[in-house]
Swiss-Prot record:
Residues 247-478 are annotated as: Spike body and stalk (antigen domain). A motif (KID motif) lies at residues 643-645. Disulfide bonds join 317-379. Keywords: Capsid protein, Coiled coil, Disulfide bond, Hemagglutinin, Host cell membrane, Host cytoplasm, Host cytoskeleton, Host endoplasmic reticulum, Host membrane, Host-virus interaction, Membrane, Outer capsid protein, Viral attachment to host cell, Viral penetration into host cytoplasm, Viral penetration via permeabilization of host membrane, Virion, Virus entry into host cell. Residues 483-517 form a coiled coil. Residues 509-775 are annotated as: Spike foot. A motif (DGE motif) lies at residues 307-309. It comes from Rotavirus A (isolate RVA/Human/Italy/VA70/1975/G4P1A[8]) (RV-A). One of its GO terms (cellular component) is host cell rough endoplasmic reticulum. Pfam families: Rota_VP4_MID, VP4_haemagglut, VP4_helical. Belongs to the rotavirus VP4 family. This strain probably does not use sialic acid to attach to the host cell. The keyword Transferase does not apply. This is Outer capsid protein VP4.
Length: 775
């Protein structure tokens, strides 16, 4: 039958190992390499030893004590202390704005009796009577507010450090007065602060006002020792001037150049735009159940201007470390439920892979000194309506996270047409307001970012930032390093699978049921399964190998492998143990179904909780001991074959994912039954179990011990027409014992007859099974 495809995939897994071994031998084959002179001459490989290179830091540090500078005349900036180191008696500095402010400071050495001295101030000779009867120097601050007035002593600083300070700030001129080490500041007002200039006759320093405490310390206690040595030479003030140059956001610097290779350092300002992808899958049936709401990788391409240059960029957004939530509104078919919906929180990461068409990405193969910095962005979730057939719709809304830059590595993006060497920016998460909830349910006030509507109507989220890297590139700019040498951190995320899933699932409405039954009965093999894609035998063999490589890691293949190992262990123990009661006891070891059921014999509720696990194991036994009836895997494989033939997007790259996913996800709601005389025992994956008579369909008590005995030696049958459908059919139309027996055994001829008669109950049941064949 059609399910032969799954059995072939399971039994032919050995060919995959052989294929891998052949590929490995081929890759280890020796090759001749031509070596040219130069430390980087080996054209296929980068240098072995890499230094850390230049470490760039854009932080500008302003010195606390800037100087000393030579005597000069200039207009001092606001908010900076000018600290003057007087080294002789006489005029220390002169300062004026030529309107309402004239001041000069004169220095008087210790032990001076009252005396008249001549000083040249602002180009004029002035006579002041001065005296100093202390052991310290005195600095007289002479001041006038009009050119017609005479200078008078406004403040005096008595100091043993011989330091004088002046500051322009807040519309006032600030100076020190008093006696060290307890000198303090005082100020004079002026209406024209910005135009005040100063002529300094001694060495001086510049200190930012933010470091005023240090300036106060120097005035009262003196300069640091290093400033008082002869090795400190004052510089002209012009040496402090900065040649302002507009920073280049798009800069390429040659770090080194030797032979065939050169090291290029790239700086780039970037704008990252990305969006989240998601997948919402509704379970077939009455329309009240959803199977999953999950995140998917999403590509986004856009253009932006960078330093006048038009840049084309491409991003891929994916998530890691999702949290799985679920909601079950009840056990009835009309109760709303979500089997799994994904939420990202503090333990999650968002990855954004970025590429643009600049030179930095052209040869991004051998890279070092990779650094980056990005802004943060807040993502707020939108609303999603669960459109149930009857009643008020539940609505999932809200949820928010903030994304913060957490690191950068190399990666490779795969688009539909080309693979791109990229930068992967890792973003950590913090949860934010608002919380998310599902209206009309008990799910309220949960924090995180659900996958239901992550973009919230926005075309994209945007982050700006900057990165730099040093790349080893060919000296010849026309040569591009082969991408095959790139070391990537991931492979293709979903490729075209998202679009393919949507197309694949939409084809369910176009499948003719009569042809489906016929197709399910055909012994389809791998080559007939894939013939709709490629006609040549060679390509079909290659695709079959690729499918087996992927299928080998599927849940179904893993379960079969575990079962085989258990069976071997059971057979081995049977051959060694002479007290074995029967072969059935050993055979039962491979499923553990007998033990599972026996262990719960004391509690009927426990039976319900275990039947889901048991039914999955029954699928494996049915596959090994095939009956004449049709199985769920026959329908699953037939639908898969039909959709492969109808699909326009399936190719050899996506086929392995499709076949493997179909084996795991097609028809998740399955029922299996075991017959004994005129009684049927039936369990399903939802935890329901029934026991009933074939003649009347009357339910009888479910005998757990009897089921445990039967499950080891009786054939397992797929309940294509389950108990509820059978009872509905009998109650409304009436069926004979022969028809009932054939439907219970999933006889394909009987099923085809009912479908050809367009019987509504049977037809609806088959339609529901087809709708469950979703990815």
């Amino acid at each position: 039958m059609a399910s032969l495809i799954y059995r072939q995939l399971l039994t032919n897994s050995y060919s995959v190992d052989l294929h891998d071994e052949i590929e490995q031998i081929g890759s280890e084959k020796t090759q001749n390499v031509t070596i040219n002179p130069g430390p980087f001459a080996q054209t296929r490989y980068a240098p072995v030893n890499w230094g850390h290179g230049e470490i760039n830091d854009s932080t500008t540090l302003e010195p606390i004590l800037d100087g000393p500078y030579q005597p000069t005349t200039f207009t001092p900036p606001n908010d900076y202390w000018i600290l003057i180191n007087s080294n002789t008696n006489g005029v220390v500095y002169e300062s004026t704005n030529n309107s309402d402010f004239w001041t000069a400071v004169v220095a008087i050495e210790p032990h001076v009796n009252p005396v008249d001295r001549q000083y040249t101030i602002f180009g004029e000779s002035k006579q002041f009577n001065v005296s100093n009867n202390t052991n310290k120097w005195k600095f007289f601050e002479m001041f006038i507010s009009s050119s017609q007035n005479e200078f008078y002593n406004r403040r005096t600083l008595t100091s043993d450090t011989r330091l004088v300070g002046i500051l322009k700030y807040g519309g006032r001129v600030w100076t020190f007065h008093g006696e060290t080490p307890r000198a303090t500041t005082d100020s004079s007002s002026t209406a024209n602060l910005n135009n005040i200039s100063i002529t300094i006759h001694s060495e001086f320093y510049i200190i930012p006002r933010s470091q005023e405490s240090k300036c106060n310390e120097y005035i009262n206690n003196g300069l640091p020792p290093i400033q008082n040595t002869r090795n400190v030479v004052p510089l002209p003030l012009s040496s402090r001037s900065i040649q302002y140059k507009r920073a280049q956001v798009n800069e390429d610097i040659i770090v080194s150049k030797t032979s065939l290779w050169k090291e290029m350092q790239y700086y780039r300002d970037i704008i990252i735009r990305f969006k989240f992808g998601n997948s919402i899958v509704k379970v077939g049936g009455l329309g009240y159940k959803w199977s999953e709401i999950s995140y998917k990788a999403a590509n986004y391409q856009y253009n932006y201007l960078r330093d006048g240059e038009q840049v084309t960029a491409h991003t891929t957004c994916s998530v890691n470390g999702v949290n799985n939530f679920s909601y079950n509104g009840g056990s009835l078919p009309t109760d709303f439920g979500i089997s799994r919906y994904e939420v990202i929180k503090e333990n999650s990461y968002v990855y954004v892979d970025y590429w643009d068409d600049s030179k930095a990405f052209r040869n991004m193969v051998y890279v070092r000194s990779l650094a980056a910095n990005l802004n943060s962005v807040k993502c707020t979730g939108g609303s999603y309506d669960f459109s149930i057939p009857v009643g008020a719709w539940p609505v999932m809304n809200g949820g928010a996270v903030s994304l913060h830059f957490d690191g950068v590595t190399l990666s490779t993006q795969f688009t539909d047409f080309v693979s791109l060497n990229s930068l992967r920016f890792r973003l950590s998460l913090t949860v934010d307001e608002p919380s998310f909830s599902i209206m009309r349910t008990r799910i309220v006030n949960l924090f995180g970012f659900p996958a239901a509507n992550p973009n919230n109507g926005n075309e994209y989220y945007e982050i700006s930032g900057r990165f730099s890297l040093i790349s080893l590139v060919p000296t010849n700019d026309d040569y591009q390093t082969p991408i095959m040498n790139s070391v990537t951190v991931r492979q293709d995320l979903e490729r075209q699978l998202t679009d393919l899933r949507e197309e694949f699932n939409s084809l369910s409405q176009e499948i003719a049921m009569a042809q489906l039954i016929d197709l399910a009965l055909l012994p389809s093999d791998m080559f007939s399964m894939f013939s709709g894609i490629k006609s040549t035998i060679d390509l079909t063999k290659s695709m079959a190998t690729s499918v087996m490589k992927k299928f080998r890691k599927s849940k179904l293949a893993t379960s079969i492998s575990e079962m085989t190992n258990s069976l071997s262990d059971a057979a081995s123990s049977a051959s060694r143990n002479v007290s074995i009661r029967s072969n059935l006891s050993a055979i039962s070891n491979w499923t553990n179904v007998s033990n599972d059921v026996s262990n719960v014999a004391d509690s009927l509720n426990d039976v319900s909780t275990q039947t889901s696990t048991i039914s999955k194991k029954l699928r494996l036994k049915e596959m090994i001991t095939q009956t004449e009836g049709m199985s769920f895997d026959d329908i699953s494989a037939a639908v898969l074959k039909t959709k492969i033939d109808m699909s326009t997007q399936i190719g050899k790259n996506t086929l392995p994912d499709i076949v493997t996913e179909a084996s795991e996800k097609f028809i998740p709601k399955r029922s299996y039954r075991i017959l004994k005389d005129d009684e049927v025992m039936e369990i399903n994956t939802e935890g329901k179990f029934f026991a009933y008579k074939i003649n009347t369909f009357d339910e009888v008590p479910f005998d757990v011990n009897k089921f445990a005995e039967l499950v080891t030696d009786s054939p397992v049958i797929s309940a294509i027409i389950d108990f509820k459908t059978l009872k509905n059919l009998n109650d409304n139309y009436g069926i004979t014992r022969t028809e009932a027996f054939n439907l219970i055994k999933s006889n394909p001829t009987m099923l085809r007859n009912f479908i050809n008669q367009n019987h509504p109950i049977i037809r609806n049941r088959i339609e529901q099974l087809i709708l469950q064949c979703r990815l």
